[in-house]
Amino acid sequence: MPALSHYRSVSSLPSVDRSFLLIQRLRIHGSSSSFPESSPSASILSGADPLKCTVSGGSLAKWITGISAGSALGFLYWSSGSSDSISGLFGGSNLLSFADSSTPSVCGVKVGDLKPRSFIPKLSLPGYSSGFIFGDAYRRKIFFNYEKRLRLQSPPEKVFEYFASVRTDKGEILMKPADLMRAIVPVFPPSESHLVREGYLTGERNPGELRCSPSEFFMLFDVDNDGLISFKEYIFFVTLLSIPESSFAVAFKMFDTDNNGEIDKEEFKTVMSLMRSQHRQGVGHRDGLRTGLHMTGSVEDGGLVEYFFGKDGSQKLKHDKFTKFMKDLTEEMLRLEFAHYDYKRRGSISAKDFALSMVAAADASHLSKLLDRVESLSEHPHLRDMRISLKEFKQFDELRSKLGPFSLALFAYGKANGLLTMKDFKRAASQVCGITLSDNVIEIAFHVFDSNQDGNLSVDEFLRVLHRRERDVAQPIAKGLSRYFSDGWKGSKNCSSS
């Protein structure tokens, strides 16, 4: 009975050795043609290390390795919810998600200390890693397109949550003024930074500190002096910013329902409610009540209304004060946009960042081509080294507010004289719109919007991008705010004539 005697000899071995021997015996019986019978058993019985013998077989080692790797990854995923545990695990280094950081900050409230917005945080990887499959330029384009669709198609709650950078101890999500700008204006990450996106989704890691330029303007009507914007104030500002600058006077006439040259609080609230019904992000809040974000209250009950009508709401708002406020609000948003691109706080932005601000409003079908033209600025040293000041940035933005007459001037000149030169462009801006554009601004614009690279401006493409930005910020629905103010202007003229 050789098998029985062999079993008895094996039973005298330690339990671990017996287990490995049984595994080996099963493998030997199953594949006797491939492995000599004497080799494995002899090695074990002769006192050789059973683990080494098993590893030489290969399958058990792979099985154990797989379990170990899976357990390690599972532990990493579980522990990624705690910044302390992760930093300790990797020697104290900060970890970010695939999405990379939003915008690092130099001011205010630290967002890195805020609580995560999900019970299941995403697996994190080292921030600013050069080992991503796709380069930063490609990832910026992907995130930019996503954020643009988010602004135009998502409900206001989602837009607010994505771009807001502050969460209080009570769980309320708030915005800084720079967050408001990014939620409304399509912007690229600054070219002088390593950033690839402007916000983050629920469940992702907090992006650390967000860069936010301080805003004295928003502090004027900040009741609690924290410099932060609530969701109801966000809806309020989005609605006001949808009014074109050329329609400020028309807007006031619409507010002044009794035609006495002043606006009281009830008139203001009535027309604001109507305006929200014409705005895509405000349409869900026509009744003035906030839904979502676990908050309740009227959109009109905020610091701005108190700024307009006093604490008791009895003061009247005059035309001059309203018009000045609207112009200051528009200018402040422009300043925040410039500060966003002025990443190194030099008081000027690069030619590339200025070009990015111009093409950011382009539709998706034209964006890639325009971005290629922006990237080609680096091939021309005199363009690459140009810097644009805040004054030049504002002067170019004025063209958007006077796009109607400027468009007519460009098309009329093009039909009469053919190609449009830089001198013609500058003269049209000066004589028709009263705007003085610098040579640097015009040269960058001609380079970016020269579709066939013949040295001339593609007028259609240039004007289409400028017009699209105005439309995207307004985000009208149904007839649209432009029609709304047009009808209001006709009504006010009829009232005046009668």
UniProtKB/Swiss-Prot annotation:
Locations listed in the record: Mitochondrion inner membrane; Mitochondrion intermembrane space
Targeting signal (transit peptide) range: 1-29
Major subcellular site: mitochondrion
Recorded family membership: Belongs to the MICU1 family. MICU1 subfamily.
Binding site residues for Ca(2+) 2: D256, D258, N260, E262, E267
Tissues of expression: Expressed in both green and non-green tissues, including roots, shoots, floral buds and pollen.
Single Gene Ontology MF annotation: calcium ion binding
Residues that hold Ca(2+) 1 according to the record: D222, D224, D226, E233
Domain notes: The EF-hand domains have high affinity for calcium.
Domain of life: Eukaryota
Function noted in UniProt: Calcium-binding protein maintaining matrix calcium levels at low concentration. Regulates mitochondrial calcium dynamics in planta by restricting influx.
EF-hand domain ranges (all copies): 216-241, 243-278, 329-364, 437-472
GO-annotated cellular components: mitochondrial inner membrane; mitochondrial intermembrane space; mitochondrion
GO BP, one annotated term: calcium ion transport
Gene3D superfamilies: EF-hand
Disruption phenotype: No visible phenotype.
Residues the record lists as binding Ca(2+) 3: D450, N452, D454, N456, E461
InterPro entries noted in UniProt: EF-hand-dom_pair, EF_Hand_1_Ca_BS, EF_hand_dom, MICU1/2/3
Alphabetical UniProt keywords: Calcium, Calcium transport, Ion transport, Membrane, Metal-binding, Mitochondrion, Mitochondrion inner membrane, Repeat, Transit peptide, Transport
Entry protein name: Calcium uptake protein, mitochondrial
Organism of derivation: Arabidopsis thaliana
